[in-house]
Swiss-Prot record:
Protein name: ATP synthase epsilon chain
Record text on subunit structure and interactions: F-type ATPases have 2 components, CF(1) - the catalytic core - and CF(0) - the membrane proton channel. CF(1) has five subunits: alpha(3), beta(3), gamma(1), delta(1), epsilon(1). CF(0) has three main subunits: a, b and c.
Primary residence: membrane
HAMAP family: ATP_synth_epsil_bac (MF_00530)
Organism of this sequence: Prochlorococcus marinus (strain MIT 9303)
Residues spanning the membrane: none
One annotated GO molecular function: proton-transporting ATP synthase activity, rotational mechanism
Family affiliation: Belongs to the ATPase epsilon chain family.
Keywords carried by this UniProt record: ATP synthesis, CF(1), Hydrogen ion transport, Ion transport, Membrane, Thylakoid, Transport
UniProt keyword Nucleus present: no
Gene name of the record: atpC
């Protein structure tokens, strides 16, 4: 038995195929999906989705969105996504270091739009790095 998985971003279809198992980064923690899973709709956080196909794990960096599970069909609608294999690890690491420095620089400051954007940039950069591993 397998799952039918579709990962859709506004500008592209990132994944459309079958999977043996999916691990989603929900806003309340990681959720594992296997064939026969109960119906579910959940919000997704910025993070890494893991997909097992043919016994091998693949990673997809997600930039937040929603997932629906219905009768072995998993549909993931996200703000943005990148296959881990397509991310340049060196560039992603450099972007993570820049984002980390920006967040550290703003530590102790009052909450602001700029501080929230810096934290989101850091979260996206971290997800991209994690997806390369």
């Amino acid at each position: 038995m397998s799952l039918t998985l579709r990962v859709l971003a506004p500008d592209q279809s990132v994944f459309d195929g079958t999977a043996e198992e999916v691990i989603l980064p929900s806003t309340t923690g990681l959720i594992g999906i296997l064939p026969g899973h109960i119906s579910l709709v959940t919000a997704l956080d910025i993070g890494v989705m893991r997909v097992r196909t043919n016994g091998a794990w693949n990673s997809i960096a997600l930039m937040g969105g929603f997932a629906e599970v219905e009768a072995d069909d998993v549909t993931v609608l996200v703000n943005g996504a990148e296959l881990g294999d397509s991310i340049d690890a060196t560039t992603a690491e450099a972007e993570l270091e820049q984002a980390k420095a920006k967040v550290s620089q703003m530590e102790g400051q009052e909450p602001s739009t700029e501080k929230i954007k810096a934290q989101q940039t850091f979260n996206r950069a971290r997800a991209r790095v994690q997806a390369t591993k």
